[in-house]
UniProtKB/Swiss-Prot annotation:
Biological processes per GO annotation: L-phenylalanine catabolic process; response to oxidative stress; tetrahydrobiopterin biosynthetic process
Organism for this UniProt entry: Dictyostelium discoideum (Social amoeba)
InterPro entries in UniProt: NAD(P)-bd_dom_sf, Sc_DH/Rdtase_CS, SDR_fam
EC number per UniProt: 1.5.1.34
Record field: catalytic activity: 5,6,7,8-tetrahydropteridine + NAD(+) = 6,7-dihydropteridine + NADH + H(+); 5,6,7,8-tetrahydropteridine + NADP(+) = 6,7-dihydropteridine + NADPH + H(+)
Signal sequence range: none
Protein name in the entry: Dihydropteridine reductase
Residues that, per the record, bind NADP(+): 6-30
Length: 231
């Protein structure tokens, strides 16, 4: 019987790559996003990550008798600015919606749909391990995401028994958007999306390879060599 992976943000750059990779390994792929992913076996579109939409998509997946072996939240965004920026509060609201609420929505979906012993992964940020004065809203929401990861690893965090809650903390991902806005950067120091998908597949298929429940896993690429560090 094939296993199931659910990706929130399955139409974005990272999410679509994860769907593509797992599908190539004969996994049943499920995408939830604001737009359809035609490559996924099941693609659910939502208008927002509010309570009604999330409850509705959970019901739709349950109606297909699908239980999830791996859940990955690849949804999110970035915004710069410090407290003096004219659009600071606008960026705060945007980052809460894109980063923090998507993490909370993921936690609820995972609690309802993940199999016992399953893998649950949120996308944090290496930058949020330190001060982020030039991008306060982004750093704060990613730091809060790290907190959620650890809470879900607790016995009473709400995930099914035996589950592993992890955070992946990239430095810079090699995405079309990053290439567009940082065209002068050294792309050899950016992590290919395929490497992230491959690592998630390793953790999904070999539970012994997983970091300790609640771990934040930082990864950084230098000269096309990626180092993964469990924090």
């Amino acid at each position: 019987m094939s296993k199931n992976i659910l990706v929130l943000g399955g139409s974005g750059a990272l999410g679509a790559e994860v769907v593509k990779f797992f599908k190539s390994k004969s996994w049943n792929t499920i995408s939830i996003d604001f737009r359809e992913n035609p490559n996924a076996d099941h693609s659910f579109t939502i208008k927002d990550s509010g309570e009604e939409e999330i409850k509705s998509v959970i019901e739709k997946i349950n109606s297909k008798s699908i239980k999830v072996d791996t859940f990955v939240c690849a949804a999110g965004g970035w915004s710069g600015g410090n407290a003096s920026s004219d659009e600071f509060l606008k960026s705060v609201k945007g980052m809460i919606d894109m980063n923090l609420y998507s993490a909370f929505a993921s936690a609820h979906i995972g609690a309802k749909l993940l199999n016992q012993g399953g893998l649950f992964v949120l996308t944090g940020a290496s930058a949020a391990l330190n001060r982020t004065s030039g991008m306060i809203a982004y750093g704060a929401t990613k730091a809060a995401t790290h907190h959620i990861i650890k809470d879900l690893a607790s016995e009473n965090g709400g995930l099914p028994a035996g589950s592993t809650s992890l955070g992946i903390l990239p430095v810079t991902l090699d995405t079309p958007t990053n290439r567009k806005y940082m065209s002068d950067a050294n792309f050899d120091d950016w992590t290919p999306l395929s490497e992230v998908a491959e690592k998630l597949f390793e953790w999904s298929t070999n539970s012994d390879s997983r970091p300790t429940n609640g771990s934040l896993v930082k990864f950084e690429t230098k000269s096309k060599v990626t180092t993964w560090t469990n924090l």
